[in-house]
Amino acid sequence: MTSRGPRERAASEQVLRLRRLWEEHVHRPFPGTGTDPRLQEVALYSSWLGSIVEAALEGGALDPLHADMLKIHRAEGNRELFRAGGELGDPVRSYVARLITIEDILISLPVDK
């Protein structure tokens, strides 16, 4: 039996936290309908982030390409996403907050070599 160091344990805990939050997220309905471009922005972000989450959960770490994509996305900011959450009210605001929490967890995962 091998013992894991503090870094590996922390990474495992973050993966478990990500899995729980993602499972909660995918089992909740999308908070809006219609053709509002702000809702479409939120849906697009959710889909994009979801593909990164699924890969990270499968491998237990962040793919290097996904890590780069997340860094670029964070550098560009979430202005449109924040605006949509603020303007569309509470169900969307809560949904966006959960997505940003998921993104924060992803960023904290180790990057696969």
Show which residues each predicted segment covers.
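Charged, low-complexity surface segments at secondary-structure and domain boundaries
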Residues: 1-8, 54-59, 82-84
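N-terminal leader/targeting helix
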Residues: 1-25
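Residue-identity detector for threonine
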Residues: 2, 33-35, 101
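Generic serine detector
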Residues: 3, 12, 46-47, 51, ...
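Amphipathic alpha-helical interaction modules
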Residues: 23-76
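Amphipathic alpha-helical binding modules
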Residues: 81-113
